[in-house]
């Protein structure tokens, strides 16, 4: 059952479009400030939809996990050049928290600096945006609404003689069964713990212990899938009936259009603002250089190096 809130009153097709656009926007050059703004909006929507802080804490915990994970990874990517001056390294990488980068045994030391921290934060914000928008879609949309919404969204495929009904039911089941799998996994672990089974720390690294969960979770999920299929049929959804109907529901169409339009407008404004800051105004916005960015690009003679720096700007910003 989905809770009654603003998002649950929007048409499923518009929510699917919003979800697809959000997946695309998450990888566009919004800039650090833009990603923080959109994540703050998504987190506020998560709290409004869930009406408690548990889900927000879970998504925020994943954000912190990916932030620290990317710090470790980027510490091996953005290394100071031991043959360059300290001022040149600082212009390229920003201030050092740990000034590694020296060669020892042919291997560079791990380093943490401003550039690696910014890149790690940007990647973590992009991932948390994906988590938040997927949760908002599933929490505000019932399974039969998802099925009918995907079927309507894939209507152009009918002209190519592609059946959209199996695709829609598969999409709906995948989205709705992910929380069920998590709940069944927790329930079975608690049942095994009552019987004296001890997982201990770092049990996810022990495949022998995990094997005791695979079969029970699989069987329980299959049973839930059958129950979901019966629920869909009870709501009027049948794959072999091309003239199927379902109960009419009132949706806030204009509210959905305004919501989707404002999100697209905000994303475009943030991208334009980031493009202006990074390329023309402030060279210290996404990374540090002593010259303006466009002047720095003009001084690069290698096309491959120029393309690399432009992609680097998009990745960070």
Swiss-Prot record:
Major subcellular site: membrane
Membrane-related topology note: Multi-pass membrane protein
Location(s) in or outside the cell: Cell membrane
Pfam families per the UniProt record, alphabetical: CbiQ
Keyword terms of this UniProt record: Cell membrane, Membrane, Transmembrane, Transmembrane helix
Signal peptide per UniProt: none
Ranges annotated as spanning the membrane: 18-38, 58-78, 92-112, 130-150, 165-185, 202-222, 253-273
Gene Ontology CC annotations of this record: plasma membrane
Protein family membership: Belongs to the CbiQ family.
Protein name: Uncharacterized protein MG302 homolog
Organism: Mycoplasma pneumoniae (strain ATCC 29342 / M129 / Subtype 1) (Mycoplasmoides pneumoniae)
The organism's taxonomic lineage, starting at the top: Bacteria, Bacillati, Mycoplasmatota, Mycoplasmoidales, Mycoplasmoidaceae
């Amino acid at each position: 059952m989905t809770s009654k809130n603003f998002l649950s009153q929007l048409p499923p097709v518009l929510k699917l479009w919003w979800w697809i656009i959000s997946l695309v926007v998450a990888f566009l050059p919004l800039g650090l400030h833009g990603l923080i703004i959109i994540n703050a909006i998504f987190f506020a929507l998560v709290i409004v939809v869930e009406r408690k802080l548990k889900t927000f804490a879970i998504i925020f915990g994943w954000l912190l996990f990916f932030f620290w994970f990317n710090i470790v990874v980027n510490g091996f990517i953005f290394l100071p050049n031991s043959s360059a001056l300290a001022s040149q390294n600082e212009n390229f990488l920003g201030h050092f928290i740990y000034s590694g980068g020296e060669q020892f045994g042919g291997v560079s030391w791990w380093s943490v600096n401003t550039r690696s921290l910014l890149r790690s934060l940007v990647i973590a914000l992009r991932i948390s945006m994906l988590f938040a928008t997927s949760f908002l879609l599933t929490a505000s949309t019932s399974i039969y609404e998802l099925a009918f919404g995907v079927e309507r969204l894939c209507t152009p495929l009918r002209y190519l003689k592609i059946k959209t009904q199996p695709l829609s039911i598969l999409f709906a089941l995948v989205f709705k069964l992910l929380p069920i799998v998590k709940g069944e996994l927790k329930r079975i672990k608690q049942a095994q713990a009552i019987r004296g089974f001890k997982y201990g720390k770092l049990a996810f690294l022990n495949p022998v212990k995990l094997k005791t969960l695979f079969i029970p979770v699989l069987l329980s999920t299959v049973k839930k899938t059958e129950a979901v299929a019966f629920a869909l049929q009870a709501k009027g959804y049948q794959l072999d009936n091309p003239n199927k109907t379902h109960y009419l529901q009132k949706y806030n169409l204009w509210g959905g259009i305004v919501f989707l339009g404002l999100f697209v407008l905000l994303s475009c404004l943030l991208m334009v603002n980031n493009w202006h800051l990074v390329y023309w105004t402030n060279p210290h916005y996404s990374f540090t250089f002593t010259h303006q960015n466009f002047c720095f690009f003009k001084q690069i003679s290698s096309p491959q190096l120029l393309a690399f720096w432009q992609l680097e700007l998009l990745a960070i910003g």
